[in-house]
């Protein structure tokens, strides 16, 4: 883009950018309100707003830069001033538009791209040009200017130079030699900028930031110097407290932000109307800094950022109205050129020649006027053509004058006065001198206020440093006290643990002695039990041998007795027993014999009783018959009695035989019973011996064996416990010695810690004093030491340590 001519009038360029709906708005199903009738217009609420260009939500960062800010680079390098600032409500995308993601070719904003393009243009310009580039970065936070490159500089004041151009006095100016250094300055400033979290934005800017790039170029041959300033402004967004939920400090920040933006809107409105003689630039520091950008000597580009959401419709309309008003503002731009002595001399000669010509023309006009007044008629050919001369003079003035000269010959604005007559040149000069004097006094007061503020800030910083040092010392003392208490508590705990361990060891030793005594006692009892067991075993063996011998002796008798029993059984026809005589054991055989004998005895008794009863009946009948016979009543009956008597006599041998057999049976029974009793007695003796040496002895033996097993187990457990305790005893003693050593070490460490803390405290105080002295010395040196300028010559490729970054930014801007 070719630079405009000096004194050219140009309007403020306004571009509109609509961001996409964010996640919250999409989640709330907000409607997308704006419509785009054309590339340079936007419709909202039935009203159409026209700007230089409208960027839709899908517009990339590169397209925004190419369309809105690319031409500013050439203007700045041609000696013009330039301004780019973004305006809009909070969370509308201003910081994203101005800064973006630095280092990302796709997401980087206007500032990194414009920085890269400035150096790319410099590298392609005439090699006889030498550039001096310096940057400043400051913010307006709560109506106070803070230096972002030096956070210690706060509440900086605004002054005016000899051309009545406002500037921030005392702001750090860092000379740079490449895009990397500029981006590093931006990163340093961003880390010091005020941001906060609100309901509408996680990284809400709480201040207006101004990044100023001053490019001064000098031609080595002609010594011609041009100076261009580029203001890159990121405004904080206007806020509604009901939406952002601001409280406390954030609320106060929002108030100051809205106040400065309101002052900016008033200035825009005053400039847009063009009828007001006074524009309130001094109402806010923001408008004071942007004074040249709004209605002054600057090519200004305004990017209004707006939200498309129905939720923010009112703020979006206000933003669009602001842009429409700003578009009507007209600036008068001039080249900031510093002339050499030869150029001033040439222009002086030219002005002198022009004045001579004008003087001759004025003299000719005066002669013509005198002739007319004298009544002489002057022919038309002799008339002096003042219009051509005036046009020539004006063209010469406009073509050869400098901005400084034009400012010097420009009429001063009328001063307010109480006189009703015309203001003379002397009064005008007087008023001008008074105004200059008042401005000088105002600047002096600003300087005094600035000095007092700086001194106050230094004192405040010193107080803060002292408080921090005191707080640190108190914290260190508290930490040391806590550590001391902790060490003491640990030492007491260790001592208590040592005492408990000694007590436990003593108890273990006592228990060990008791267990050893019990073990010895159990050993003795075990020996006694073993001896008793051995004697019982011997007695059992003897009883067993005696029993076997007795059984051997009784074997033939038992067999003889069995044979007798079998004979008796055969005689009495006990078939069931006879058939089982070979299979039944002795005791079963005896039982069966007892049953058989009892049965025979019962039959014998029954037969004896029946025969006795029959005999008694027969005797009774016989006596009765004898009585009847004696009485002679029945002879026949007598005969019968005789027959019966004869029968009785015949039966008597049988009865005798039965009686003899019964006697034999009784004798046999007695013998059998005797043998059986003897056998049973022998069995009872044997069983008695068995009972004496059997269940009771076995039960006692079992009891003793169980006790023996238990005692054996207890003995083994005691032996194992004793062995374990003997193994653990050296470990416990070692641990006890270790704990005692640890207690001693902790006590020593506690003493050393106290000594170190005291030494560190003294060292810290000395270090604080040294740092303060170094800061004092550095500040003293800064006051008198010059700045080192980094010249840049076109045609020489710039190399930096981070070449990738310097290469990536230009490519991203030219893509």
From Swiss-Prot:
Protein's GO biological process: anterograde axonal transport of mitochondrion; anterograde dendritic transport of neurotransmitter receptor complex; axon guidance; embryo development ending in birth or egg hatching; establishment of meiotic spindle localization; establishment of meiotic spindle orientation; establishment or maintenance of microtubule cytoskeleton polarity; locomotion
Comp. bias regions, Polar residues: 797-815
Subunit structure: Oligomer composed of two heavy chains and two light chains.
Organism: Caenorhabditis elegans
Recorded superkingdom: Eukaryota
Free-text function comment from the UniProt entry: Microtubule-dependent motor protein required for organelle transport. Plays a role in endosome transport. Required for the transport of mitochondria along the axon of motor neurons. Involved in the nuclear migration of hyp7 hypodermal precursor cells. Required for the formation of dendritic branches of PVD sensory neurons. In non-ciliated neurons such as the PVD and PHC neurons, required for the organization of minus-end out microtubules in dendrites. Also required for the minus-end out orientation of microtubules in dendrites of AQR gas-sensing neurons.
UniProt keywords, alphabetically: ATP-binding, Coiled coil, Cytoplasm, Cytoskeleton, Microtubule, Motor protein, Nucleotide-binding, Transport
Domain notes: Composed of three structural domains: a large globular N-terminal domain which is responsible for the motor activity of kinesin (it hydrolyzes ATP and binds microtubule), a central alpha-helical coiled coil domain that mediates the heavy chain dimerization; and a small globular C-terminal domain which interacts with other proteins (such as the kinesin light chains), vesicles and membranous organelles.
Protein name (record): Kinesin heavy chain
GO cellular component, one term: kinesin I complex
Summary of the knockout phenotype: Conditional knockout in PVD neuron results in a complete microtubule polarity reversal in the anterior dendrite. Conditional knockout in motor neuron reduces the number of mitochondria in the axon. RNAi-mediated knockdown results in reduced dendritic branch formation in PVD sensory neurons. RNAi-mediated knockdown results in an altered distribution of recycling and late endosomes. RNAi-mediated knockdown results in defects in nuclear migration in hyp7 hypodermal precursor cells.
An annotated Gene Ontology molecular function: microtubule binding
InterPro entries in alphabetical order: Kinesin-like_fam, Kinesin_motor_CS, Kinesin_motor_dom, Kinesin_motor_dom_sf, P-loop_NTPase
Pfam family, one: Kinesin
Broad class of where this protein is predominantly found: cytoplasm
Gene (name only): unc-116
Chain ranges of the Kinesin motor domain: 11-329
Region (Disordered): 788-815
Annotated coiled-coil segments of the chain: 335-374, 422-554, 695-785
Similarity remark: Belongs to the TRAFAC class myosin-kinesin ATPase superfamily. Kinesin family. Kinesin subfamily.
Localization per record: Cytoplasm, Cytoskeleton; Cytoplasm
């Amino acid at each position: 883009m070719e630079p405009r001519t000096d004194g050219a009038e140009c309007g403020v360029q306004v571009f509109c950018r609509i961001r996409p709906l964010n996640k919250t708005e999409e989640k709330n199903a907000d409607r997308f309100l704006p419509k785009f009738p054309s590339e340079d217009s936007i419709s909202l609420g039935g009203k159409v707003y026209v700007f230089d260009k409208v960027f839709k939500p899908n517009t990339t960062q590169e397209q925004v830069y190419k369309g809105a800010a690319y031409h500013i680079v050439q203007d700045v390098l041609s000696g013009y001033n330039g301004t780019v600032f973004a305006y809009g409500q909070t969370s509308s995308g201003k910081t994203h538009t101005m800064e973006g993601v630095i280092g990302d070719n796709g997401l980087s904003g206007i500032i990194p791209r414009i920085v890269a393009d400035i150096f790319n243009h410099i590298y392609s310009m005439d090699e006889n040009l030498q550039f001096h580039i310096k940057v400043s970065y400051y913010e307006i936070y709560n109506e106070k200017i803070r230096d972002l490159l030096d956070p210690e500089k706060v509440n900086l004041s605004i002054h005016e130079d000899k051309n009545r151009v406002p500037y921030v006095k005392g702001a750090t100016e860092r000379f740079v030699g490449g895009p990397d250094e500029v981006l590093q300055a931006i990163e340093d400033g961003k880390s010091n900028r005020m941001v906060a979290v609100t309901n509408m934005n996680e990284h809400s800017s709480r201040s207006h930031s101004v990044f100023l790039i001053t490019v001064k170029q000098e031609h080595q041959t002609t010594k011609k110097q041009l100076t261009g300033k580029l203001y890159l402004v990121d405004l904080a967004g206007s806020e509604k407290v009901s939406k952002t939920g601001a409280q406390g400090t954030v609320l106060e920040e929002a108030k100051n932000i809205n106040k400065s933006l309101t002052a900016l809107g008033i200035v825009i409105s005053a400039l847009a109307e063009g009828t007001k003689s006074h524009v309130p630039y001094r109402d806010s520091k923001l408008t004071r800094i942007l004074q040249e950008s709004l209605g002054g000597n600057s090519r200004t580009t305004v990017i209004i950022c707006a939200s498309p959401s129905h939720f923010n419709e009112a703020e979006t309309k206000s933003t669009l109205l602001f842009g429409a008003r700003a578009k009507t503002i007209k600036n008068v731009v001039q080249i900031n050129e510093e002339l050499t002595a030869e150029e001033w001399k040439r222009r002086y000669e030219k002005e002198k020649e022009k004045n001579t010509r004008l003087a001759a023309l004025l003299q000719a006009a005066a002669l013509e006027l005198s002739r007319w007044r004298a009544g002489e008629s002057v022919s038309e050919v002799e008339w002096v053509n003042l219009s051509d001369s005036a046009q020539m003079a004006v063209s010469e003035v406009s073509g050869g004058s400098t901005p400084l000269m034009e400012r010097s010959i420009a009429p001063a604005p009328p001063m307010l006065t109480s006189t009703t007559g015309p203001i003379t040149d002397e009064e005008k000069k007087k008023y001008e001198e008074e105004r200059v004097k008042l401005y000088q006094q105002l600047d002096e007061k600003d300087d005094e206020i600035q000095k007092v503020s700086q001194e106050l800030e230094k004192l405040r910083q010193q107080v803060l440093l002292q408080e921090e040092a005191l707080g640190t010392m108190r914290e260190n003392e508290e930490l040391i006290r806590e550590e001391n208490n902790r060490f003491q508590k640990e030492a007491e705990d260790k001592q208590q643990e040592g005492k408990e361990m000694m007590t436990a060891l003593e108890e273990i030793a006592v228990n060990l002695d008791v267990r050893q005594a019990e073990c010895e006692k159990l050993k003795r009892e075990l020996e006694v039990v073993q001896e008793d067991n051995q004697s019982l075993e011997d007695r059992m063996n003897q009883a067993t041998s005696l029993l076997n011998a007795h059984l051997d002796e009784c074997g033939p008798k038992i067999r003889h007795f069995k044979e007798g029993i079998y004979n008796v059984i055969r005689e009495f026809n006990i078939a069931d027993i006879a058939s089982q005589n070979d299979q039944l054991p002795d005791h079963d055989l005896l039982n069966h014999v007892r049953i058989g004998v009892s049965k025979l005895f019962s039959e014998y008794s029954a037969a004896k009783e029946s025969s006795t009863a029959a005999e008694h009946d027969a005797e009774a009948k016989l006596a009765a018959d004898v009585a009847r016979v004696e009485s002679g009543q029945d002879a026949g009956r007598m005969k019968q009695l005789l027959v019966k008597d004869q029968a009785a006599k015949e039966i008597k041998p049988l009865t005798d035989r039965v009686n003899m057999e019964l006697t034999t049976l009784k004798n046999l029974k007695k013998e059998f019973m005797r043998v059986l009793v003897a056998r049973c007695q022998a069995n009872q003796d044997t069983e008695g011996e068995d009972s004496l040496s059997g269940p009771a002895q076995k039960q006692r033996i079992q009891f003793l064996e169980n006790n023996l097993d238990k005692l054996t187990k207890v003995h083994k457990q005691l032996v194992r416990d004793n062995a374990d305790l003997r193994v653990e005893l050296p470990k416990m003693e070692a641990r006890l010695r270790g704990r005692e050593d640890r207690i001693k070490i902790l006590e020593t460490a506690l003493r050393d810690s106290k000594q170190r803390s005291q030494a560190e405290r003294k060292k810290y105080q000395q270090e604080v004093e040294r740092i303060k002295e170094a800061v004092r010395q550095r500040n003293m040196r800064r006051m008198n030491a010059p700045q080192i300028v980094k010249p840049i010559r076109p045609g020489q490729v710039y190399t930096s340590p981070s070449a990738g970054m310097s290469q990536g930014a230009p490519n991203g801007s030219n893509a």
